[in-house]
Regions:
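Flavin-dependent oxidoreductase catalytic cores
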Residues: 1-333
Length: 333
């Protein structure tokens, strides 16, 4: 069993990563339904919460069925982060996660996200202040370091633990790498193998297949996997990993009919939550993966991603179901 503070999780839990414009309540709920053990919100600006910015506040919404859920916030000003904690607490999440890993320039330029990797003392002080300011468990998501020459993740993780961080998720790249090259899980294993570490250490980055997840568990010895891009438009990924763990066999993927029905549910949930316009527009990014590998699909996909009218998108789903039915997508490669 793995525990984040008092939250009990199964051995080697699978966590849905916080992803901007992806990890919203509808998608999180679908991932939870399909095997995710913990889900995290999109990252939320502490300054946006303080200003009561509509987009930031909307990200605080939680469905009861998706628990345990962590709300992730980012910022570099301790006072602003503490004020945002008070706002977050009112929505009753299970966990508050601090984003010390986002590599995007507009975040880093303000010293937030991965930008704080240039100031480890501030990173630790901010974490300590937040731990003291709330009774909710504080967790951290970060990267190996700012660049290859500044990787001190073993020391950093221990310092975060010592000020009260209850779990740490580490992406196996530096900020300088962004998302290029391959994630290196070896430094994450060094964190886990530090005899002074006793909080869960979760790996993140390039967990793209059930086999890779098993490698993270069995070869690298981590406590769990945080899964991001592999789940976009494919919430089945979590159950497929768990099936592979139990049997050593790959679970047959969903039929085209099942994929279409999931996409339909996803769109309807998004509309119910965000309204028609945002629901239609922001669900589009999932369709490539929902229907990846279907031959001669371009015409159907264009209808899904170009129409602003949900009736047209639902009609496109109907045509796909009528055309392909319960067929399986041909195995690629």
């Amino acid at each position: 069993m793995v525990k984040i503070d008092s939250i009990e999780l199964p051995d080697f839990p699978l966590l849905l990563a916080p992803m901007e414009d992806v990890s919203d309540p509808p998608f999180r709920a679908l991932c939870k339904e399909n095997g995710a053990d913990v889900v995290y919100t999109e990252f939320i600006s502490s300054e946006g919460l303080i200003r009561d910015a509509a987009k930031s506040v909307m990200k605080l919404d939680i469905y009861e069925k998706e628990r345990p859920v962590g709300i992730q916030i980012f910022g570099a000003n301790i006072d602003s982060m503490l004020r945002s904690v008070e706002i977050v607490e009112k929505t009753n999440p299970d966990i508050i996660d601090i984003n010390f890993g986002c590599p995007v320039k507009k975040v880093v330029s303000k010293g937030a996200g991965a930008g704080i990797l240039k100031d480890i003392d501030l990173m630790v002080s901010l974490t300590e202040a937040m731990v003291k300011h709330t009774n909710l468990p504080i967790t951290v998501k970060t990267r190996l370091g700012w660049d290859h020459d500044s990787i001190k993740i073993v020391e950093v993780a221990e310092r975060l633990q010592d000020v009260g961080c209850k779990a740490i998720s580490i992406h196996g790249r530096t900020r300088a790498q962004m998302y290029k090259g391959e994630a290196d899980w070896r430094p994450i294993t060094e964190v886990k193998n530090n005899p002074r570490m006793h909080i869960p250490v979760f790996g993140n980055g390039d967990v793209t297949t059930p086999k890779k997840a098993k490698e993270m568990r069995d070869v690298y010895g981590l406590d769990g996997a945080m899964i991001g891009r592999a789940s976009i438009g494919y919430p089945w990924f979590f159950n497929e990993v768990k099936h592979y763990f139990k049997t050593g066999e790959h679970l047959a993927g969903p039929t085209i009919s099942e994929r279409t029905e999931m996409a339909r549910r996803h769109l309807q949930m998004a509309i119910d939550w965000k309204g028609e316009h945002l629901g239609v527009v922001e669900t589009r990014r999932h369709y490539t993966n929902y229907f990846k590998g279907i031959p001669h699909f371009k015409e159907h996909r264009l209808k899904m991603v170009t129409s602003d009218d949900p009736k047209d998108v639902f009609a496109a789903f109907d045509i796909v179901q009528e055309t392909f039915g319960n067929a399986m997508i041909p195995e690629i490669g």
